[in-house]
Design a protein with these regions (language model features):
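P-loop NTPase motor domains
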Residues: 1-203, 218
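Conserved ATP-driven motor cores of ASCE-family P-loop NTPases powering translocation/secretion/packaging/pilus
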Residues: 195-238
Length: 238
């Protein structure tokens, strides 16, 4: 949802970014205080990761954080991932950081940082009692639309986990997701798998598209699987 409309670049950079994200997120989740477990902390860590091409021995603040963690727990998942990232030379590491910064640029917007600073949605509890939750997006400005896809992705995962771990596999209250403008809210990773398993957890999904081609544009070969898991397909002629 943040790679833009251009062609996919070298897969190496995407994998390198993912490696760094894994290290930093693991540190934040397992070592950081609860109030700092958010996207803002991730962005700040990346912003503070200075790299000097002419001085391979230079260490930034994040390097020292991981050095301390490595001394306490050398087998920590975050430490092991960060060590792999540090295999990159100064020039390569700088390119990785630039790619991360460009991808996460929207999270530098003050309004978005405020939204990401704390959790007030409690998406995992939507099936505990009767609740109505609305996501409103602009139909002319797509800047923040990816947040809805992010929220949906987390919501489905959290609700399935809660159904399995707390309620024996089924939520006490059915959660019905009416996803209008599905083509304009970004892609939910693994949606083709999600739609196949949520029904048993008392979750249903209704997707609204202007045309079938919109679903295919977003999910490519998985679009057929997504549509195949829908009980009904309704077409309203223009």
């Amino acid at each position: 949802n943040t790679k833009g409309d251009g062609k996919e670049g070298d897969e190496f950079w995407t994998k390198a970014e993912t490696l760094l994200y894994c290290a930093l997120v693991a540190y934040i989740v397992f070592e950081g205080p609860e109030e700092e477990r958010n996207m803002n902390t991730l962005v700040e860590m990346i912003n503070s990761m200075e790299v000097r091409e002419d001085d391979e021995s230079f260490k930034n603040a994040v390097d020292y954080m991981f050095d301390g963690l490595a001394k306490r727990n050398p087998q920590h998942f975050a430490v092991r991932q960060y060590a792999k990232y540090k295999l990159a030379s100064g020039k390569t590491a700088k390119s990785i950081l630039i790619s991360c910064g460009a991808r996460l640029a929207p999270f530098d917007i003050a309004e978005l940082r405020e939204i990401m600073s704390y959790d007030e949605l409690e998406l995992d509890k939507l099936g505990d009692e009767k609740t109505a939750l609305f996501f409103l997006i602009s139909d002319t400005d797509s800047t923040y639309n990816f947040i809805v896809a992010l929220a949906f992705s987390q919501m489905f995962n959290l609700l399935c986990e809660r159904a399995d771990n707390k309620y024996g596999g089924r939520l006490p209250h059915h959660v019905r997701v009416l996803w209008d403008e599905a083509a304009n809210t970004g892609q939910v990773p693994g949606l083709e798998k999600i739609v196949a398993v949520i029904r048993s957890r008392e979750i249903s999904l209704t997707l609204f598209y202007q045309a079938m081609s919109q679903c295919k544009a977003l999910y490519k070969d998985h679009a057929e699987t997504i549509m195949g898991n829908m009980d009904n397909i309704v077409f309203l002629g223009g």
